[in-house]
């Protein structure tokens, strides 16, 4: 079984496919079922919903034995905290009413492989059994006792154990909430997606420790880590954060091996190694209790009392046991631990536990023997180092020392987090059902996980319990210093806290022999490449290293010089190198969006044009003014095409086409729209004066007017070509950032921002003029073709270009100018084209394709009908009305004298008439 567990750990680390792991799980689960026959030690509590629990009840055993001595605080205290929390929840009428929480609690023996074997108990109910071919000796089918279904797991404690268990539980989608695992790698939501924790990850405490070290003025420290995920990942996080923060050097990183032949010799060697850098007095420790105790003992043997300045992680926290008999060597040690509070209710609960009232805890008898150093008369007693008999009348806290273990609060919070998630899940899925409804039973772990990640309640310490997207709790730490001198109560003293930022009371700190002055842990390492030495007066052996900043490089040991204009410092600032040349790439996010929009627009434009050509002689197409419609669609098409020219690699040909087409598409579009709106305006203005049709309203005249307007744009472009021929340049100023590593030379066309605006200026003038005409014709009856759609188009287009101008010029000094301006320009043109296409043509295409019954000739309209409509519109405009637009026609009829000539005209449908 152990070998299979080790094999699974290897396969998990090698990221084997889930199918392979699941096959092995079936084998392991079968073995686990057999294992229960001879290893029955687990706690079972019946309930409607069962939670799993993983606790280090025992320490690691010697070679060949999975479990060792019982762990009174880390094991029994935490286990009883879960039982206490279950009792509290089950007696709370407001939390999970009509639902009883049960439990299946297992011992991990502080070993990841053993914990893996134990945790297979949680997945037995999820493994299908095929018993179709199985018969008992009497010929009857077998009856299997279905194991309880575990919906979530509380635990584990050690990070290495949680990592191993999490790999199994995620395969069966069982959510897991740890109360003590802080390894940073557990924050990887891709690998440990069903893992959450009520304690912050080590990356947070590493940041807190970096802040502490810097606040004390130390810039030269060593690190010490126990071998394993917790220690090594903690130091890795500390090192990474210290590098990012700057001003902090790591003298050396020492690892404490897990398997040691001679503990004394190994730890003496570690102390000697730390003394190789005597100026690095500060030692940052991520280690377990036993390693902390051994390193302090080794420092004492080396007669280094007062030399080392210890900075301990939460594994040290405020524990007394690792410091026993080594208080003098530990004086001044600074430690941190997650902010916590003593749960008074648990103290009352635990100190009242006896052998009689706590039979549900199968390990409590063993704890009793160890705690009171006595031997029970029951069979199976493991206490062999004493002849003192237990009476059963001993009391915890009275006949033995008792102090609440530091993680009790987090165990309770973890159980409550699971309970709150189940409570909200029950309310949502079983609103009108008492207890656990079938929908909740079948919901699965993935749904429960969503509820877990959304919990937010005040925990046992009064602080909010919540999880971020990676399942981590927020970082809140208390900072302690161990003080024994000049104090009436030797021990840990609270000197600060860390919640995203450090609050440290330096005046409350003291060091060896009661010294208040902060001892130093600083010295100067040789300057790195790219730094110059700046010697300090009176200390020639130490100096400050000043980096060559900006575009400087290290000319010699004492001097920095500037690189040439088109160069930047190399990576280590020992010389200069050419600045890379960049352009807007097709795969860049800045280009992908405009290109995507342009491609959609081109497809839509071609579709509209094809539809109009296909139905060229239908009333709707003829009513829209076929000639100008095709001109307008051509302009819209060119507006989309310019996107590709703006993103293409600049050369003389591309730059030439940019100049031609930059404003041409817009010019064609707005010239056609201006001609249309002007024609509508002139017709209705003329209709108010006489029945004579205005001049130049025929299709040929309209095309001639449009061509004349477009020719002005082309003439301006040709003059531009003659005055300033197209060319390409490399602009080093645009991307010459403060950080030379980000400096780039921009390959672009020799076109200034002002030239771009001038090229677009004529088109904008046409757009504004067209908007003016759209406003003037806003009172035209809605059935007179395209006056109002054109108006809406122009209003929207004006908004687009009003937004474009501040963005375009507001980013002129930005390091991302090339990308922002190009993207803004192309998107603005795409949006302008899309607005025109969507408002003017999509409704027509919709009718043509989906409602052909509306695409019919209703009645032709003479100019007299237009005159009549103009007269009616004029009369209507003189009478104020509060009615909505939908009642305009009714009011039009109400305001016409029935005896007037206009009123005697027959009502004419204005649909599909060319205006």
Curated annotation (Swiss-Prot):
It is found in: Cell membrane. InterPro entries: ANF_lig-bd_rcpt (IPR001828), GPCR_3 (IPR000337), GPCR_3_9-Cys_dom (IPR011500), GPCR_3_9-Cys_sf (IPR038550), GPCR_3_C (IPR017978), GPCR_3_CS (IPR017979), GPCR_3_mGluR7 (IPR001883), GPCR_3_mtglu_rcpt (IPR000162). The chain crosses the membrane at residues 591-615, 628-648, 655-675, 703-723, 754-775, 789-810, 826-850. The keyword Phosphoprotein applies. Its main location: membrane. G-protein coupled receptor activated by glutamate that regulates axon outgrowth through the MAPK-cAMP-PKA signaling pathway during neuronal development. Ligand binding causes a conformation change that triggers signaling via guanine nucleotide-binding proteins (G proteins) and modulates the activity of downstream effectors, such as adenylate cyclase that it inhibits. Disulfide bonds join 67-109, 249-541, 374-390, 430-437, 523-542, 527-545, 548-560, 563-576. Residues 879-892 have a biased composition (Basic and acidic residues). This is Metabotropic glutamate receptor 7. GO terms for cellular component: glutamatergic synapse; presynaptic active zone membrane; presynaptic membrane; receptor complex. Gene3D superfamilies: 3.40.50.2300, GPCR, family 3, nine cysteines domain (2.10.50.30). Glycans are attached at residues 98, 458, 486, 572. L-glutamate binds at residues 159, 180-182, 230, 314, 407. Residues 35-590, 649-654, 724-753, 811-825 are extracellular. One of its GO terms (molecular function) is group III metabotropic glutamate receptor activity. Belongs to the G-protein coupled receptor 3 family. Pfam families: 7tm_3, ANF_receptor, NCD3G. Residues 616-627, 676-702, 776-788, 851-915 are cytoplasmic. GO terms for biological process: adenylate cyclase-inhibiting G protein-coupled glutamate receptor signaling pathway; adult behavior; associative learning; axon development; behavioral fear response; chemical synaptic transmission; conditioned taste aversion; memory. Coiled coil: none annotated. It is a multi-pass membrane protein. Residues 874-895 are annotated as: Disordered. Homodimer. Interacts with PICK1. The modification Phosphoserine is found at residue 900.
């Amino acid at each position: 079984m152990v070998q299979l567990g080790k094999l699974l750990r290897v396969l998990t680390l090698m990221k084997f496919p889930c199918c392979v792991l699941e096959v092995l799980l079936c084998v392991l689960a079968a073995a686990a079922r057999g294992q229960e026959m001879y290893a029955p030690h687990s706690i079972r509590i019946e309930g409607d919903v069962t939670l799993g629990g993983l606790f280090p009840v025992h320490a690691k055993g010697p070679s060949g034995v999975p479990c060792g001595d019982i762990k009174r605080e880390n094991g029994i205290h935490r286990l009883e905290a879960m039982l206490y929390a279950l009792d509290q929840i089950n007696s709370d009428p407001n939390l999970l009413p009509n639902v009883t929480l049960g439990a299946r609690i297992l011992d991990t023996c502080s070993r990841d492989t053993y914990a893996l074997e134990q945790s297979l108990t949680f997945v037995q109910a999820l493994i299908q059994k095929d018993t179709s071919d199985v018969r008992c000796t009497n010929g009857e089918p077998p009856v299997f006792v279905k194991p309880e279904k575990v919906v979530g797991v509380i635990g584990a404690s050690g990070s290495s154990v949680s990592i191993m268990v999490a790999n199994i539980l995620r395969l069966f989608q069982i959510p897991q909430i740890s109360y003590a695992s802080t390894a940073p790698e557990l924050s990887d939501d891709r690998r440990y997606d069903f893992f959450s924790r009520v304690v912050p990850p080590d990356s947070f405490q590493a940041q807190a420790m970096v802040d502490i070290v810097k606040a004390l003025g130390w810039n030269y420290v060593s690190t010490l880590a126990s071998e394993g995920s917790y220690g090594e990942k903690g130091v890795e996080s500390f090192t990474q954060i210290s590098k990012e923060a700057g001003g902090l050097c790591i003298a050396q990183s020492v690892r404490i091996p897990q398997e040691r032949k001679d503990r004394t010799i190994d730890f003496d060697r570690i102390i000697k190694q730390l003394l190789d850098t005597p100026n690095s007095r500060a030692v940052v420790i991520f280690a377990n209790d036993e390693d902390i105790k051994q390193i302090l003992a080794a420092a004492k043997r080396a007669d280094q009392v007062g030399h080392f300045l210890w900075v301990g992680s939460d594994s040290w926290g405020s524990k007394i046991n690792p410091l026993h008999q080594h208080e003098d060597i530990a004086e001044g040690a600074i430690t941190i631990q997650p902010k916590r509070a003593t749960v008074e209710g648990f103290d009352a609960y635990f100190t009242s536990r006896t052998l009689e009232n706590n039979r549900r805890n199968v390990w409590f008898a063993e704890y009793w023997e160890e705690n009171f150093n006595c031997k029970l008369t029951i069979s199976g007693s493991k206490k062999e180092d004493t002849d003192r008999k237990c009476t059963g009348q001993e009391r915890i806290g009275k006949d033995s020392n008792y102090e609440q273990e530091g993680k009790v609060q987090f165990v309770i919070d973890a159980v409550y987090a699971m309970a709150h998630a189940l409570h909200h899940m029950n309310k949502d899925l079983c609103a009108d059902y008492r207890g656990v409804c079938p929908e909740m039973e079948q919901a699965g772990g993935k749904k429960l996980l969503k509820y877990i990640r959304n919990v937010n309640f005040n925990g046992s310490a009064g602080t909010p319990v919540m999880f971020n997207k990676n399942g981590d709790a927020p970082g809140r730490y208390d900072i302690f210093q161990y003080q024994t001198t000049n104090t009436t109560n030797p021990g840990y003293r609270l000197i600060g806290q860390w919640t995203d930022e450090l609050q440290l009371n330096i005046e409350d700190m003291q060091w060896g022999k009661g010294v208040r002055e902060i001892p130093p842990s600083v010295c100067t390492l040789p300057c790195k490449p790219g730094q110059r030495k700046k010697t300090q007066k009176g200390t020639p052996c130490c100096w400050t290293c000043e980096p060559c900043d900006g575009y400087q490089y290290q000319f010699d040991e004492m001097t920095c010089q500037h690189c040439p204009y088109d160069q930047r410092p190399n990576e280590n600032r020992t010389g200069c190198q050419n600045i890379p040349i960049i352009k807007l790439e097709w795969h860049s996010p800045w280009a992908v969006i405009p290109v995507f929009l342009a491609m959609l627009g081109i497809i839509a434009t071609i579709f509209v044009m094809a539809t109009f050509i296909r139905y060229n002689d239908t009333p709707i197409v003829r009513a829209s003014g076929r000639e100008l419609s095709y001109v307008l669609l051509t302009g819209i098409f060119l507006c989309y095409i310019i996107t590709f020219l703006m993103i293409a690699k600049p050369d003389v040909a591309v730059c030439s086409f940019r100049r031609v087409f930059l404003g041409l598409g817009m010019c064609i579009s707005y010239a056609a729209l201006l001609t249309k709106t002007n024609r509508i305006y002139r017709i209705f203005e003329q209709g108010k004066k006489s029945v004579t049709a205005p001049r130049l309203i025929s299709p040929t005249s309209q095309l001639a007017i449009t061509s004349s307007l477009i020719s002005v744009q082309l003439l301006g472009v040709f003059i531009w070509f003659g005055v300033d021929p197209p060319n390409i340049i490399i602009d080093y100023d645009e991307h010459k950032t403060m950080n030379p590593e980000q400096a780039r030379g921009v390959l672009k066309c020799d076109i200034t921002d002002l030239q771009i605006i001038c090229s677009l200026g004529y088109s904008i003038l046409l757009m504004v003029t067209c908007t003016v005409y759209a406003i003037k014709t806003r009172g035209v009856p809605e059935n007179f073709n395209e006056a109002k759609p054109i108006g809406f188009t122009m209003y929207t287009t004006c908004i687009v270009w009003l937004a474009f101008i501040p963005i375009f010029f507001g980013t002129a000094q930005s390091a991302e100018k090339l990308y922002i301006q190009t993207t803004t320009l192309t998107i603005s043109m795409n949006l302008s084209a899309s607005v025109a296409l969507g408002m003017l043509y999509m409704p027509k295409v919709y009718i043509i394709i989906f409602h052909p019954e509306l695409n019919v000739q209703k009645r032709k309209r003479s100019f007299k009908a237009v005159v009549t409509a103009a007269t009616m519109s004029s009369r209507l405009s003189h009478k104020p009305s509060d009615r909505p637009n939908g009642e305009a026609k009714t009011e039009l009829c109400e305001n016409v004298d029935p005896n007037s000539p206009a009123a005697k005209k027959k009502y004419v449908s204005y649909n599909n008439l060319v205006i």
